Amino acid sequence: MADEKRPASRAWLGYLLIAVGILVLSGIVRSRGRPLVPYDEAVAEVRRGEISAAIVKPDEIELVRRESPQRPEERVRVTRLPGVEDEPLVRALLDKQVRIEAKSPQTSVWMQVAIWMLPLVLINAAFFMMLRRAGQGAGGPLGFLRSKAKIYDRSRQDPVRFSDVAGVDEAKDELVEVVDFLKEPSRYRSLGGRIPRGLLLIGPPGTGKTLLARAVAGEANVPFFSLNASEFVEMFVGLGAARVRELFEEARKSAPSIVFIDEIDAVGRTRGGLGALATHDEREQTLHQLLAELDGFDARTTVILMAATNRPEVLDPALLRPGRFDRQVIVDRPDLRGREAILAVHARRVPLASGVDLGLVARRTPGMVGADLAKIVNEAALAGARRGAREIGQADFDEALDRSQLGLRRRGQIMTAEERRRVAYHEAGHALVALALPAADPVERVSIVARTIGALGVTIQVPRDERQLVTEQEIESRVTVMLGGRAAEELALGQVSSGAHDDLGRATALVREMVTRLGMSRRLGLAALARTVGAPMLGVLQEERTCSEATAREVDEEVRERLGEMYLKAKQLLVDRREGLEAVAEALVLKETLRGEELEEIAAVSTRRKIAVGPPSAA
């Protein structure tokens, strides 16, 4: 219905513009329709007595030609000579005693109307179009004031259930209680309980906050109003507050109901800030109205406000006080079991081969959120489709993980034989040092295939399980493995290359962390010499030093000393396994990629061969 009215409502505007244009053009045509004759020809006609009358205007002279057998009476125009007062044409007219009429510049009535009307019409048309765009076709002359909230309709949409949400069990438990309250409010009220008026979902992007809200809508079987907070704020001051009032009025009429506002930090930012210049009238009016609506909830009204944000630190304290958003639900990054459960949910929609290990995929994706894992499953499905398979295998998940974490294969990357050999020794060094250290994570795969992120090779280690704590021995093992590539280059080829710069940077940062923050310094003892400021949950971290310059110099010296020790340890481990280093590097040059089982087999064969031959005899 709205789509049919929209062209009709604009038709009158088009007709009006056409009419004004016709008026303007008609005036121009009437004034400019008479022929223009050359100046000298007009003077000659006057002197021959062929002109009966003249009308003198500021910029031209209109001449009336006498009627003759050859032609009827007609009017012609002559452009006056600029800057000449007593011009020849005027003198000729006076000499021939032609009737002369002077006319001041006048515009026709219709032209004047058109000149006044056209700007007004254009301004009103522009304002009307802005109002229509602000309202996006909402009905009525003030339709743009109405709320843009979308009402969830279970009959038209595929409902999301709590069974479709995995990896965030604690947050899901909180929301299950909300759904239960909406279904049976009397059970809580009989004991004097009051459900929180507002629930704020807090978590990094992609963790499933909006999905949880949709699951609440699917389970509660009550009207569910959802919109983004940015839809409140428009260019007209006061429009956001009006939409807030409209939204909550609709929710109260439909109670019990749920209102969900996504990205609430768009209107809920702290007021004031940097002074008067930081004030945004429209956003603050919207926030004030939102606070007033939260305060206006009747205890007997079963309207629950849910909101989501990934920036809780910028929200106004008045929004978070008890009685408003008095329950905050943390939707954090999933742990190992949570990631495996999320992968299982997404894997329901794709055909999996029997040998696929989702637990291995979960171990290879620490720190990933639900959106990342959904992308991994989709990339695996695309990889299987590219090779023409009917099922998704483990190799497809490996390819998806590599594309996500390492980038695409660089098929056009051409390395010389010497560079290829050096990369093979480098990755073999990482892998063999990891095999030699009991506290190091197992090696899942080694590859010298170049990737688009700039890596010429990669050694992938997958932890056996996900731990919350790490020991000093485990940190030292990680650093030693990082330095194993550089040590292998020096041992096998006699000199190092720039390929180890990233390993060295990460190793240095990890050792500095041990010395300054973890209390693992040998020289400085138990002291935290740096602190982290920022929002750890959102990954916004900065390190602030809390020690003197002299202590900082000691920190630098200890970092260099311990890095040197671990480098020598990595080098000695490779000296003891020199045959294995050569064998693994040769296998990488030939095959490009070795799985963990192949790596262990090559290393074991080399070790058995060395034991059988025995150490070299002394001269």
Curated annotation (Swiss-Prot):
Cited CDD domains: RecA-like_FtsH (cd19501)
Periplasmic membrane side: 30-108
Membrane-related topology note: Multi-pass membrane protein
Any one GO CC term of the record: plasma membrane
Binding site for ATP: G203, P204, P205, G206, T207, G208, K209, T210
EC numbers for this chain: 3.4.24.-
Record-listed Zn(2+) binding positions: H426, H430, D503
GO BP: protein catabolic process; proteolysis
Record's cofactor remark: Binds 1 zinc ion per subunit.
Cytoplasmic compartment spans: 1-8, 130-619
Catalytic center residues: E427
Enzyme's top EC category: hydrolase
Ranges annotated as spanning the membrane: 9-29, 109-129
Cysteines joined through disulfide linkages: none
Subcellular location: Cell inner membrane
Subunit structure: Homohexamer.
Role noted for this protein: Acts as a processive, ATP-dependent zinc metallopeptidase for both cytoplasmic and membrane proteins. Plays a role in the quality control of integral membrane proteins.
UniProt similarity note: In the central section; belongs to the AAA ATPase family. In the C-terminal section; belongs to the peptidase M41 family.
Name listed for the protein in its UniProt record: ATP-dependent zinc metalloprotease FtsH 1
Annotated source species: Sorangium cellulosum (strain So ce56)
